[in-house]
Amino acid sequence: MSEWDFYPCTIDDRPASIFVDLYFSRIGPPVGADTHFVARIAMLDLGTHGMGTPSEAEVLYAYETELEEKLSAHEIVYVGRIRTRGVWQMSFYGPASSKPYFQVSPPDRASTIEVHYDPAWSFYEQTLSPSIERRNWMRDRAVVEELEARRDPLVIPRKVEHWAYFKTADAREAYVERATQDGFTDEKIDSDEPSSFVARMSREDPVDLESIHAAVMILV
């Protein structure tokens, strides 16, 4: 199984794109996959932001797929890719015993490999995995893409509701007070669960990705 997704970010103040299999953030590392295998390929056509042009990506996507299939036969799993500063960097994890099989030969491009003992999957958790803000961006993007598929005019403001759940009434009230200061309305709801403290906030906003993500991050 896999749960691949991507998000844009910056690394060392330079534009970057990260493609990561979020499946492992739920189930944890496979047994014995204690070693981080890194393959870096120098892109020939960097593009405007150093993340590669579509034609460059087409070549390296094909090679990436080929490499993943080859390494999977030796218990090495592909977990993510970073594109930034003209480098196409792929990360794999597997047992240390698989090191002899980790060889990279991209078409007409310079490459380097590194192998690190990383039983805690620190690189996966701290670098590849999205922050809370980026996770919210990914969820917001999915919603916007669904609206686009329905031909929604995203830039037209409309009432948008946001739900939040709390363990105490005090936590809910503090949240509502802060949100109302930013122009949100507390849509009162009756809950059948006396221990359930729910806030339903609304505000008129466009629902293009930039606008809706900005609204969500006010409420997070």
Regions found by a protein language model. Name each.
Residues 1-220:
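Long, contiguous binding/interaction regions
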